[in-house]
Amino acid sequence: MKSIIFNEIKKILECDFTLENPKDKNLAHFATPLAFSLAKELKKSPMLIASDLASKFQNHDCFESVEAVNGYLNFRISKTFLNELANQALANPNDFSKGEKKQESFLLEYVSANPTGPLHIGHARGAVFGDTLTRLARHLGYKFDTEYYVNDAGNQIYLLGLSILLSVKENILHENVEYPEQYYKGEYIADLAKEAFEKFGKEFFSEENIPSLADWAKDKMLILIKQNLEQAKIKIDSYVSERSYYDALNATLESLKEHKGIYEQEGKIWLASSQKGDEKDRVIIREDGRGTYLAADIVYHKDKMSRGYGKCINIWGADHHGYIPRMKAAMEFLGFDSNNLEIILAQMVSLLKDGEPYKMSKRAGNFILMSDVIDEIGSDALRYIFLSKKCDTHLEFDISDLQKEDSSNPVYYINYAHARIHQVFAKAGKKIDDVMRADLQSLNQDGVNLLFEALNLKAILNDAFEARALQKIPDYLKNLAANFHKFYNENKVVGSINENDLLKLFSLVALSIKTAFSLMGIEAKNKMEH
């Protein structure tokens, strides 16, 4: 709707301007401060300029009123125009708030957790954010592909195999073992050890078989990770292996050398990342010739940046903040525009239950498992709460609040609005087709404002995507639900003179809730279950 109104205003003003959304919809649905920017050029007061501009909009079908207020030009949308938009939305509900197909393309890499154990709650935040960003981008018309980079090489995979070997020796063969400083623990390691022992037999468990054991366990963990993601309604398009890029390492090093991006010192090869804003240079090849994790990651990013996407987006844990300058430096040395590599950081999550820290999982050792939290509160509540705050800010929440059936639980509160609307239609004995002819002319000011809010979803979605600020969607839904509940409590619906107008208004509110919830990966309920 905002883009339609913007274009209508531009036809008359014939100049550049910005369109704002005033908080108080009783004053205006949209406003522009254009008069202030023209004041110096026209040598007039903003109030006079705004009054002159307002006079150009007399008898315009889109606007109920256009007024000059304190130098601002305030626009109120007409009921007739809102009704036209309502008819379009209700006639094609699956297309409501969708964007036209766009040329811009994106590749999102996210989750990419080491396949050394089940997903924990820290992984879950980036996973939910990435999946919702994907749903939103595709809804708005962008080509948006997703990828999981499987770290299936290096020391962490070896440690997985070693941890299973030591568990077999200690818990099954009852040998005395000495654990290294770093190893994987938890019930899942013991379970893997038991399964591996049954599969491979006693003779297999020696140090020379650690790589084979690690490979077997890595594949098992990747299957488990995919199951964890599916439980949270997350599907990633493709999984790419770190190992598959090893053969391309030498060619990448040659390219970096050619562009003076690397140098040799102390028997190591260094990335000259300090030349591009990093705090120091980074080792990419060790003295023994083995590549560091950064080396493989540079090869992978070179491949991603070469695939023709307009932008490559990564979602990383906040602890990877220092990794950004070195990766952008490598891409610049390789001839890419580092602005086309966008990094979104997912901050830490703290969980409480009844005000106390949530207990760590015995299955995972020192972590809270994503699957455990979903088992307690469901994937809908998990997804909502992870999207309720900006991704790069710390999030703390008490899962007990998400199990309540009252207004303190936002998922319940919004779902209750959606279910309430279905209940009202059932009570009236009507369906949406029965109210399509209603013209909405009887709506009072609060009703018009509620209708405007419901129809304004697309503008919210565009803002959320462009700013990567997905919390705008749950914020919108909370406000919409609150305004609906208030309006419902203050207005008689079934049996009223304007019953059809009100039911048509409510159907738009329900459509907005259902659409926005769907983009968040949440199912809108038609009936509340107790």
Curated annotation (Swiss-Prot):
Keywords (A to Z) from UniProt: Aminoacyl-tRNA synthetase, ATP-binding, Cytoplasm, Ligase, Nucleotide-binding, Protein biosynthesis
Motif 'HIGH' region: positions: 113-123
Enzyme Commission numbers on file: 6.1.1.19
Residue ranges the record marks as coiled coil: none
EC supergroup of this enzyme: ligase
GO cellular component, one term: cytoplasm
Catalysis: reaction(s): tRNA(Arg) + L-arginine + ATP = L-arginyl-tRNA(Arg) + AMP + diphosphate
Recorded GO MF terms: arginine-tRNA ligase activity; ATP binding
Superkingdom as given in the UniProt entry: Bacteria
Family matches, as SMART domains: Arg_tRNA_synt_N, DALR_1
SUPFAM superfamilies linked: Anticodon-binding domain of a subclass of class I aminoacyl-tRNA synthetases (SSF47323), Arginyl-tRNA synthetase (ArgRS), N-terminal 'additional' domain (SSF55190), Nucleotidylyl transferase (SSF52374)
One family name in Pfam for this protein: DALR_1
PROSITE patterns for the chain: AA_TRNA_LIGASE_I
Family: Belongs to the class-I aminoacyl-tRNA synthetase family.
Subunit structure: Monomer.
Protein name: Arginine--tRNA ligase
Protein species of origin: Campylobacter jejuni subsp. jejuni serotype O:6 (strain 81116 / NCTC 11828)
Lineage: Bacteria, Pseudomonadati, Campylobacterota, Epsilonproteobacteria, Campylobacterales
Gene: argS
